[in-house]
Amino acid sequence: MSQSYEAGNANMGQGEDDEFDGYFEDFDNDIMPNSNNGQRVGTNAGLSFNDEVNVNDDDFLDIYNMSPRERLMHNIRKNVQKLQFYFYSLRLWQQIIIVLLGIMLMIMGILLLVFHNAILHKVVVTSNDLREKMSTHFILMVLIFFVAFPPMIGYSLLSTTTGLIYGVSFEGWVTLALGSVTGSIASFVVFKTILHSRAEKLVHLNRRFEALASILQENNSYWILALLRLCPFPYSLTNGAIAGVYGISVRNFSIANIITTPKLFIYLFIGSRVKSLAESESTGSRVFDLVSIIITLLILSLTAWLLYFKTKKRYLELQNRDRQVSTDQLPELSFEV
C-alpha cells in the first residue's frame, strides 16, 4: 500500500510537471511561434521579407559607438542590402521588368540632359494645345480616376501634368480634385465589398500599412483618416488597404478625401513651375523655378514623414499596451510545497 501511495504521488507530481511545462511551452510559442518544420524563428524559416530583414539588425551598442558619418554609411549599406534582398526574392520575370525599367529611365535621363531645350519647348507647346481642347478635362479626370485602383501607378505624374497644363488655378484644382476624390471612393467601395480579401492582404503588405490599420482600428474618424492620407503611402495601394480595415465607413472616407483636397495645389504649383522653367530663357529665372520646386518637394516630404513617424510611434504604443494587457491576463501560478 505504501508503494502504491508513493507511485500515486509520483504520477500526480509528474502530471503537474507536465502541465507546468506545457503551460510555459504554450507561452513560449505565443511569444516566438514555430515555423512549419517545427524549428524556431532563429533559423529564418517561414519569415516574411520585413521580418527576416529585421532579424539581422545590428545591436544598439554597435551603432552607439559610431560617428554620425559612420552611422549614415551604415544605414545606407543596410538599406542597399534590404533592396538587394527584396530584388532577389522576386520572380525572374519581375526582375527582368525592373531591369528594363531601370535601363529606360537611364536612357530618358541621358536624352533629357542632351536635348533638354528641345524637350522643354515641346512640353510648353503641347501643354498649351491641350489647354485649348475641351476634352482635356475629361481625359485627365478619367486617367486620375483609374490610377486610384491598386496596383495602378502614375498619380503624381498625372497630378503634376494637370498643373503643367492649367497652372495654379481653380480650373486645374477642380479637375484634379474630382478625379482624385471619385477615384479614391470608387476604389474604396470596390475593395471593401467585392475585393475585401485582397484589401486585407494589402494591409499586411508591409509594416507601414499595419501601423496605419492599427491606428484606424482605435480611431476611424474622418480627421484621423485625413491625417493618414497625408502620410507618404502609395496613393492607389492606400485606397485598397484602408478598405481592409474593419469599421471604416464610406462616409468618413469620403469626407477625409474632400478635406485633403487643398493638398492638390502643391502638385499644381510644381507643374506650373516646370512650365515656367521651360518658358524662361534667363538663367536666374530657371534657377528660381528649380529652387522653388525643390523647396516645395522638401516641405511636402518633411511634413509627410513627420506624420508617418507620429503614426509609427502611436503604433508602437498600441503594441506595447496590448502586450502589457496580455501579460496581465496570464493566470497566476501558485507553488505549494
UniProtKB/Swiss-Prot annotation:
The keyword Disulfide bond does not apply. Belongs to the TVP38/TMEM64 family. It comes from the Eukaryota. InterPro entries: Golgi_membrane_TVP38/TMEM64, VTT_dom. It is a multi-pass membrane protein. Present with 11300 molecules/cell in log phase SD medium. Interacts with YIP5. Residues 117-137, 191-251, 308-337 are cytoplasmic. Residues 1-95, 159-169, 273-286 are lumenal. Golgi membrane protein involved in vesicular trafficking and spindle migration. The VTT domain was previously called the SNARE-assoc domain. As there is no evidence that this domain associates with SNARE proteins, it was renamed as VMP1, TMEM41, and TVP38 (VTT) domain. GO terms for biological process: mitotic spindle elongation; vesicle-mediated transport. One of its GO terms (cellular component) is cytoplasm. Residues 163-274 are annotated as: VTT domain. The chain crosses the membrane at residues 96-116, 138-158, 170-190, 252-272, 287-307. It is found in: Golgi apparatus membrane. The gene is TVP38. It holds the Pfam family VTT_dom. Keywords: Golgi apparatus, Membrane, Transmembrane, Transmembrane helix. This is Golgi apparatus membrane protein TVP38.
